[in-house]
Structure formats: structure tokens, C-alpha cells
């Protein structure tokens, strides 16, 4: 089990007259949606043994609802009148960030069911899509977006127009924006991309939250403190940060790390300075933190108090690295769900009174066919070099309910070259079988029914 070391810092805790809070948070269990895959028959995946049971009365509650398998039924549910509670609350959340920062992984984890495609290749998400979380009287609408990219890169990689415009469009409908940064990427983690800064500057009135993702990949967690300082320009929630860390080892209690983030209020409030302290468990194995003796030592201190606070000029993004208007910061590992529940609770708290947009039975606005295409494409992206997935056209030939209630899907993957066909099929059909098997398993977890998925590969005539 992952060590429960992660922590969250909430600037809101340190309001000028706000109370001091010591926050100790624990990680959550690894998500179960990545089920183990059984062996498959060549070119197809048969019905899977022991599918998850469809709830007798799917709807609101602790389990996210399944997606309807028929396009018509799904459209009826999505367009149907929401089952408004007496005092509904709602929050539309746009998730933006560089390609591959983990936006779709986080969206899936928040939803509790995988409905968005995820892969290690960039530009997995091709257009914006909505996920819906309904919890008691609150509805969160998550807008997963394609990674923010520049028109030049979009042209070079022949990306569809929607990939440039959709993240911006999603901001128009958002009440709050989560900005994801992949902290494991040495090249990009020290600054927000120009596109992210442009997007934030264009919508400065939308509250923004910084989410540092993939912290599980960091050997030295201490660098998070420096990153926070750079990505926020040392200012969060209108106050300057004074980031300091202390590592403490107490032989009578489990070893733990205490990270201290102190906020310095604006000059007029300085007399009421209120620190916000965070406490975490000891960093994971591999961390460079020294806990070998009964010591209390200050390992690093990033004091931003003395630094001149530059006013943020909109349109001046080229010279900037961070955004000084974040209202909060989270550090998490979306892949294994670490601290995702903490973020979810926070988002639920941010919801404002307002009518729900969807019925509580809606999990995503994507149609069943879109979900299926995306999931199959995800596998092709995951296992093949980029030139192959980019050339594949997916044609669904059959989508019908079988005699035992299973969903039968036959999809033809049309490729431009014979060499691509051979790569996609793999030796003795091993790769295409694996793709069908894994996609079938994912679809079963989305639709909560047996799936018979058959994939064919054809060269474009
Ligand atoms: N180790 C680790 N990997 C992660 C984490 N979150 C996401 N990933 C991986 O990062 C890769 C990209 O994840 P996606 O969710 O597809 O990223 P994205 O931002 O939606 O990417 P685009 O749609 O291409 O913009 C995948 O291989 C994920 O498994 C994390 O917290 N830890
Ligand atoms: Mg994505």
C-alpha cells in the first residue's frame, strides 16, 4: 500500500483572521477500475467471466451510475429533465494543463469510473467531454479537455481544430478551473506553459486551483516546495507565501515529515499574520529525507516575504513563469488515487446553489459509441508508434444486444498501409487480441454488462 505521505495545502485556511489548522491527510486505496485482464481469443474478446453486477436501481449513491449501451437511451437520459433536489448545488470544473499532465486520469478518478481515454502518448484526448458527479444535493460537472497546445504545434502534428479551441471553450462554462502540472517532467514543471498562462489571463475572474500531479514519481518530495513557489510566483489567495520545511523524527511515534507553509498577509494585514501548517507522514521510500536520528532540522527555507511582489500584467505572459492568483494548491497522484478524494471533497464544498444540469443517472455526456471509439483508440495509442494510431479510421459495423443480454460490438480498423495492418495485428494476432481484450474489459466496467468486442483490421482500398 502506498505510504500515506501526501498532503494538501489550502490557502483558505490561512485567511488574515483565519484559524491555524494542522492538516493531516491520508492517501486513498488504489482504484479498482484497472482490472486484471484474462487471456483472449485471437482477434476478439469473448464474454468476460464475472462482470460487475448492474445495480438493481442505478442512480445517486456511493457508486457511479453505468453508461447506457444504447445511443438513444443514453441521449434520453442526458437530455432528460434533471431530478433536482430541494436545494440543488452545482459546480462546473474545467481541467486544463499541458498534454499528458494527467487530466483524464484525474477526471476518471474523480468520477469513480473510467470513461475518458488515458495513455502515455500526448494528445490522447481529442475534444472536450463532460463527466458528472452527483453527490447528495451537489452536482459537479467535470470538463476534461485536450492538452493545451500552440497553433504551431497543432499544425505540425496535424491536430484537429477542436484540440486548440476546446480548452478555451470549456473555460467559458467553468465556475472553477483546475490547472494540472506534471511534477515528474523536469523540462516543464518549473513554469506554467504559455498556453496555460494565456488561458488563465483570458479568464482571470474564474477561481483557479493549482494541482501538482504525479507526485508519486518524485524521489525528492522537497522540490515540491520550490515548485509551488515558482508556479504561484510566491502568492496564493492574495497572500505571499513563506515556504519552509522541517523534518522531524520522533522515536516514540512513527517518523514523519512536517512541511510548513507560512503565508504573509498583504502589508496592511501584517499585524494579523497567520501561518498555515501542513503535516504529512514521512516521505516514501527513495526520498532523500534523513530520518535516521532523533533530530529536528530545518532542511530548506524559501522565504518569499522579502521578494518584491510584481503586479501581474495580463498579456505579459511571455516573461512569467507562474500565476499569482491561485486560490488553493493540491498535491496528488491521480494514477493511484492518492489525495483525489480530498480534492473531491474540496470541490463539493465549492459548489454554489444552482440547478443541476443533468439527471443524477448521467455519468458522462459522451455517447456509448464515442466512449467505445476512445477506449479502443487509447489501446492503439498505448501499444503502437504514433504514426499508426494517427492513421487509423474506426468504423463500427455492429452494435447490438446479444441473446444473453451481452453487448456485441464489431469494429473495423481501417489503416492506410499494409505495414500498419501487420503492426496492428501483431505476431499471430497477439496485439489485436490484447487490444480487444483490454478495451472489452474497460467497456464492461463502463457499461456494467458483458461485452463481446471483435476488432478487424483492413487496409484502405
Ligand atoms: N505515475 C503517475 N502517472 C500518472 C499520474 N497521472 C497520470 N499518469 C499517467 O500519465 C499519462 C498521461 O495521462 P492522461 O490522463 O492521458 O493525461 P492527459 O493530460 O489527459 O493527456 P492528453 O489528453 O494527451 O492531454 C498516462 O500514462 C497516465 O497513466 C500519476 O499521478 N502518477
Ligand atoms: Mg486526456
UniProtKB/Swiss-Prot annotation:
Residues 89-354 form the Era-type G domain. One of its GO terms (cellular component) is mitochondrial matrix. Gene3D superfamilies: 3.30.300.20, P-loop containing nucleotide triphosphate hydrolases (3.40.50.300). Residues 39-73, 260-319 are annotated as: Disordered. It is found in: Mitochondrion matrix; Mitochondrion inner membrane. One of its GO terms (molecular function) is GTP binding. Residues 332-334 are annotated as: G5. PROSITE patterns: G_ERA (PS51713). It comes from the Eukaryota. Residues 269-284, 304-319 have a biased composition (Basic and acidic residues). Residues 285-303 have a biased composition (Polar residues). Pfam families: KH_2, MMR_HSR1. Residues 97-104 are annotated as: G1. Residues 144-147 are annotated as: G3. This is GTPase Era, mitochondrial. It comes from Gallus gallus (Chicken). The gene is ERAL1.
Amino acid at each position: 500500500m502506498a505510504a500515506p505521505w501526501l498532503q494538501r495545502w489550502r490557502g483558505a485556511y490561512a485567511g488574515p483572521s483565519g484559524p491555524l489548522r494542522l492538516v493531516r491527510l491520508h492517501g486513498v486505496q488504489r482504484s479498482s477500475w484497472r482490472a486484471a485482464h484474462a487471456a483472449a481469443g485471437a482477434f476478439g474478446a469473448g464474454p468476460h467471466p464475472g462482470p460487475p453486477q448492474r445495480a438493481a436501481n442505478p442512480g445517486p449513491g456511493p457508486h457511479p451510475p453505468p453508461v447506457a449501451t444504447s445511443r438513444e437511451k443514453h441521449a434520453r437520459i442526458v437530455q432528460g429533465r434533471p431530478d433536482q433536489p430541494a436545494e440543488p448545488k452545482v459546480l462546473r470544473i474545467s481541467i486544463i494543463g499541458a498534454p499528458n499532465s494527467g487530466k483524464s486520469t484525474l477526471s476518471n478518478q474523480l468520477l469513480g469510473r473510467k470513461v475518458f481515454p488515458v495513455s502515455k502518448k500526448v494528445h490522447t484526448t481529442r475534444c472536450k467531454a463532460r463527466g458528472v458527479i452527483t453527490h447528495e444535493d451537489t452536482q459537479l460537472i467535470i470538463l476534461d479537455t485536450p492538452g493545451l497546445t500552440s497553433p504551431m504545434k497543432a499544425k505540425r502534428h496535424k491536430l484537429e481544430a477542436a484540440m486548440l479551441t476546446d480548452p478555451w471553450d470549456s473555460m467559458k462554462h467553468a465556475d472553477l478551473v483546475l490547472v494540472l502540472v506534471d511534477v515528474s517532467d523536469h523540462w516543464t514543471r518549473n513554469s506554467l506553459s504559455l498556453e496555460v498562462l494565456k488561458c488563465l489571463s483570458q479568464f482571470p475572474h474564474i477561481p483557479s486551483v493549482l494541482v501538482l500531479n504525479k507526485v508519486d514519481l518524485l524521489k525528492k518530495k522537497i522540490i515540491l516546495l520550490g515548485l509551488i513557489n515558482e508556479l504561484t510566483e510566491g502568492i496564493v489567495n492574495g497572500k505571499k507565501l513563506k515556504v519552509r520545511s522541517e523534518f522531524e523524527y520522533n522515536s516514540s511515534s512513527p517518523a514523519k515529515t512536517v512541511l510548513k507553509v507560512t503565508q504573509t498577509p498583504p502589508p496592511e494585514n501584517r499585524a494579523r499574520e497567520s501561518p498555515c501548517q501542513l503535516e504529512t507522514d514521512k516521505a516514501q521510500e527513495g526520498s532523500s529525507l534523513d530520518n535516521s536520528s532523533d533530530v529536528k532540522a530545518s532542511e530548506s527555507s524559501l522565504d518569499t516575504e522579502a521578494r518584491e511582489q510584481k503586479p501581474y500584467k495580463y498579456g505579459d505572459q511571455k516573461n512569467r513563469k507562474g500565476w499569482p492568483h491561485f486560490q488553493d494548491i493540491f498535491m496528488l497522484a491521480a494514477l493511484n488515487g492518492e489525495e483525489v478524494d480530498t480534492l473531491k471533497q474540496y470541490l463539493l464544498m465549492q459548489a454554489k446553489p444552482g440547478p443541476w444540469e443533468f439527471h443524477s443517472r448521467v455519468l458522462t455526456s459522451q455517447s456509448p459509441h464515442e466512449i467505445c471509439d476512445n477506449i479502443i483508440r487509447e489501446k492503439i495509442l498505448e501499444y503502437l508508434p504514433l504514426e499508426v494510431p494517427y492513421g487509423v479510421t474506426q468504423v463500427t459495423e455492429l452494435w447490438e444486444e446479444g441473446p444473453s443480454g451481452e453487448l456485441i460490438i464489431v469494429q473495423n480498423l481501417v489503416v492506410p498501409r499494409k505495414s500498419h495492418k501487420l503492426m496492428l495485428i501483431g505476431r499471430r494476432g497477439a496485439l489485436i487480441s490484447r487490444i480487444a481484450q483490454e478495451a472489452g474489459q474497460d467497456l464492461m466496467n463502463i457499461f456494467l454488462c458483458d461485452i463481446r468486442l471483435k476488432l478487424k483490421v483492413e487496409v484502405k482500398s
